[in-house]
Design a protein with these regions (language model features):
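Membrane-embedded alpha-helical bundles of multi-pass transporters/translocases
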Residues: 2-462
Length: 462
């Protein structure tokens, strides 16, 4: 049972700000990895893009076990005086931050190729498959324990997106300004600076996790679920639970689009356009616009038209923007920045409401099965997100290798044109796949969500 303070303190701004800091903490390591790990290991450590992408993909498949296992551990855990989910933030904030820092060690650039590949493999699995999983799954599951009110959960989703956007702002704007240097007239990544940046962000992540722990309160008692883990049954539930399958497909393709945009930004701006400053500006503008446009209006639009409906339309618009940019092939970097920011606004609408959609899926599962499995469902969803990250890394690395990218050919004209093409085509494919997944698979329309909320309210008050 949660303690009395947690049960009686009303939901308010303290919880929303605290939950925001949780995703701020997550993304100090997640966005750093998705945006700069490939660039760091290809340009600083001298590892092939294809090898880096393959390692990232293999590591994510390890998550098939660690994510589900962590979800079961969370579901089986008994509430303490600090709640059921909050204690994990305090326990695991140090390990996840240290592992992230160890990935970006430029001092090892002179080691053998095999050693560098092994170092990346081990540290990346420690960070993503073990430590990040052990803090992110309890954090995501915690939303349903903070409040039972769908409106409160929608606000938590919005504030989570604000935290993610602020992290994108700090990392996306600050890192290119500090990490890139000019050598022989070319913009290149400084390995030693990246190591320092990774260390600073790791410290910031720990501080933000602790702020989340101290500010948030759990109010909904979530009893321990001691049912044994059945992988076959769980996989069957994915394919028989249309809502879960739909959101998993959408999440996978959303990450493919978003992380390809972020990852390729580290190549298209310095290599194709020769402007790391434009990369900082693009990150700044897209983050600010998400805060000004998406955060205030996403919840209102979702309440009026429905979460599924808003997300589908926004991804269709993003697809059109990426296709137009590919056809026009703007030579002016600021025109490209305009397309980049506009697509990110569309992505931002979906990102702002997607966490509320997860709680809708959890509610739908409880309505149909009579069992609430927050941790397990969130674990399956988290695994889908990591698959999206893996596929984007594998695809990006494979395509960069296909166009002949290496530290030696990074500025060849045919290679830089290939970089531009990848930066438009890959996100466009991801966005259209998200829209199709939501439209044809995901069944939780505005009306269906309202019916589920009413059914659960009646059931819980019996």
């Amino acid at each position: 049972m949660a303690n009395e303070m947690q049960k009686t303190t009303p939901f308010g701004m303290r919880d929303k700000v605290g939950y925001m800091f949780g995703d701020f903490a997550n993304d100090f390591t997640f966005i750093l990895s998705s945006s700069f790990l490939m660039k760091f290991y290809t340009d600083v450590m001298g590892v092939s893009a294809g090898v880096v992408g393959m390692i990232m993909m293999i590591a994510r498949f390890v998550d098939a076990f660690t994510d589900v296992t962590m979800g079961q551990i969370v579901d089986r855990s008994k509430p303490t005086k600090d709640g059921k989910f909050r204690p994990w933030l305090k326990r695991m904030c140090g390990p996840v931050a240290i592992a992230s820092f160890l990935i970006f060690q430029s001092g090892l650039a002179g080691m053998s190729y095999g050693f560098k590949v092994a170092w990346l493999f081990v540290t990346y699995i420690l960070w993503g498959s073990i430590f990040y999983t052990s803090v992110n799954i309890p954090y995501g599951s915690m939303a349903s324990a903070i409040s039972a009110d769908p409106k409160d959960r929608a606000e938590l989703s919005t504030w989570r997106t604000i935290g993610s956007t602020l992290a994108s702002l700090v990392i996306g704007v600050g890192t290119p300004m500090v990490a890139y240097v000019t050598v022989n007239g070319q913009t290149v990544l400084s390995g030693s600076r990246m190591t320092i940046i990774a260390g600073v962000f790791s410290v910031c992540a720990i501080l933000c996790y602790l702020l989340c722990f101290n500010l948030v309160r759990e109010r909904v008692d979530v009893p321990a679920n001691n049912s044994k883990m059945d992988i076959g049954k769980m996989l069957k539930s994915v394919f028989t639970n249309r809502a879960l399958l739909g959101i998993i497909a959408a999440a996978l393709f959303l990450l493919l689009a978003m992380l390809t945009m972020q990852g390729m930004a580290g190549y298209v701006f310095p290599n194709f356009y020769g402007s790391a400053a434009a990369q900082s500006t693009a990150s700044l503008l897209s983050s600010v616009l998400i805060l000004l446009v998406c955060a205030p209006f996403a919840s209102k639009l979702a309440s009026r038209f429905g979460k599924k409906e808003l997300a589908t339309v926004s991804c269709i618009v993003a697809t059109v923007l990426e296709v137009i940019c590919f056809v026009l092939k703007p030579t002016n970097v600021w025109v490209y920045v305009g397309f980049y920011c506009a697509a990110f606004i569309c992505l931002g609408f979906f990102n702002t409401i997607i966490w509320a959609m997860i709680t809708d899926v959890i509610d739908d599962s409880e309505v149909r099965n009579g069992i609430r499995e927050d941790g397990t469902i969130y674990a399956v969803y988290s695994f889908a997100r990591k698959l999206g990250q893996a596929f984007s890394s594998g695809l990006t690395g494979g395509l960069l290798t296909m166009i002949g990218y290496s530290a030696a050919t990074a500025f060849d004209p045919e290679v830089t044109m290939g970089i531009f093409n990848i930066s438009c085509i890959a996100p466009a494919i991801g966005f259209v796949a998200v829209a199709l997944s939501l439209f044809f698979i995901y069944p939780l329309t505005k009306q269906k969500v309202e019916e589920n909320v009413a059914a659960l309210a009646q059931r819980h008050h019996k």
